[in-house]
Amino acid sequence: MIRLPRLYQRYLLYLVVFVVIALFYFLQAPRVEEHIGFDLALPISHVDNLWFQNKGLEGFSNDDKLVVNIGYDECFHIGRFYEGCFNRHELKSTLTDGHQYLQRKRIHKDLRGSFGRRWFGKSEYLYYDVLYPALVDYFGSNLEKLNVEAVTGISKYPKDKSLPFMDVSITFEPISIELLQKRSYISDINILFGVDCIQPIANWTLQKEFPLVKYRYSEPAYLTYKFVGTRPVDTGAQRLQETDEGKFKIVQLADLHLGVGESECIDEYPKHEACKADPKTETFVQQVLDIEKPQLVVFTGDQIMGDRSIQDSETVLLKAVAPVIARKIPWAMVWGNHDDEGSLTRWQLSEIASVLPYSLFKFSPHDTHDNTFGVGNYIYQIFSNNDTEVPVGTLYFLDSHKYSTVGKIYPGYDWIKESQWKYIEDYHDVNLKFKTGLSMAFFHIPLPEYLNIESKTHPGEKNPLIGMYKEGVTAPKYNSEGITTLDRLSVDVVSCGHDHCNDYCLRDDSTPNKIWLCYGGGGGEGGYAGYGGTERRIRIYEINVNENNIHTWKRLNGSPKEIFDFQSMLDGNSPESV
């Protein structure tokens, strides 16, 4: 018989006790129902716009709902492997008789911030029940018998017709078609975390005066909500167009590394006594946007620092795009290797990004949930100011994935797949009516050709390089020959992120068109820097159609009004090296 050392015996005893406690909670505690849906026999949960007009509900649509109950579940979790909910607290527990007519929405964001961060512990989740306006008309006065009222307000202190809930008070009012014409009812609810959280969507309200709840080891949770009948401003996909001067300016935001809460700076340079990472990063971004006033902003990955976003990646995504949305600037986005390491998958993040105001983010027909093709491979053209049917430039956006899935053969980072290169090549050949003009491509992880410091056509000579080359290029070990596709598509400039302390542009001569391969340079204080001290920076591009040229320059966090490393990239006037 094998006898375990005393230390391991103790660990085994702890494990047995822990499993017994977990099983007790799982088997003995009352279970929580997850889904309460509409009775499918009711045909009027969705109606057309004419119905709303006839009822005097101008501005209403089937997207509108009435929040009629709010509650939260207490749960117990073991890592990310098991989570069981054993206790429920709700304001309208007497709604039992009307549940079959309601739809329950659970916000999968742990208010305690424990799930995903601790091996085991207690988690809490907010939920709310909604009723569609068409059902208000259908049931009429029976709603009062079912004790169905709707939420009209959320306040810090109790008011008339309000009920205490967590650290706030919720106000309920009776509902009817007539009252819907007069009162404002809350239609949808979400939660954002951190004292610096932002709600950039115009028809949503963020209650920042007081938190919904604040736990000791968690960022404060704030309610954000919208009212019925409020429509967002039309901010769908924008048509990209040159200015009257024949120019098109792009601000590239690389490696912002934002998270939930303000967080401390990492490798700040120059160093200050106190430094909050995200506020400093956001201020820098706002300054550059106000100075440059670009026609497009491109996020080139790692805008979200995954391990700082386990509580809620949506909060961080909204924080990243808020300065751009506030200035009504169209924006595109690709993902890096850290974005989906928080609470949301790449696909879930993409679903949010694709519908946000001024977003150009698109799914390709081949994008997959398992990321084998990546998520967010798309193309946009820039059109002439004189002839809106004639493009003057093309922009390609590709998902460069994360880490190699065949690490024993090709260790390190993943690569853009041959199927992705073929997709944009086929799209170019079939769907782009006009194929002339200046072209750029954006993704996160650099190509292997970023290592081509030495000339391929002139042995012993170096390729032109402008900017800072401080750290090793972490390109994938496998070469999917994307540079060949980019050359065939006549791409002039490629720009990526990933390596924070490199900000150079290299003119690679391994293909006939000699493509410029550029880094954006790390912009966020929440990511690494170092290498002797590296100040955060942002790169700007200006496509000049009249000159058939692309200019680029950069700005530093500490001196955003000054530019450096200016290049005219296609006229031969760039310095050979700096």
Curated annotation (Swiss-Prot):
Matching entries from CDD domains are given as: MPP_Dcr2
**Membrane-spanning residues where?**
none
| EC class name | hydrolase
The UniProt keyword set, sorted, is:
ATP-binding, Cell cycle, Cytoplasm, Hydrolase, Nucleotide-binding
User: Which biological processes are named by the entry's GO terms?
Assistant: negative regulation of endoplasmic reticulum unfolded protein response; traversing start control point of mitotic cell cycle
EC no.?
3.1.-.-
Which PANTHER family does the protein's record reference?
PHOSPHATASE DCR2-RELATED, PHOSPHATASE DCR2-RELATED-RELATED
State its role.
Answer: Required for cell cycle progression. Has a role in the completion of START.
Protein's name in the database: Phosphatase DCR2
Gene source species: Saccharomyces cerevisiae (strain ATCC 204508 / S288c)
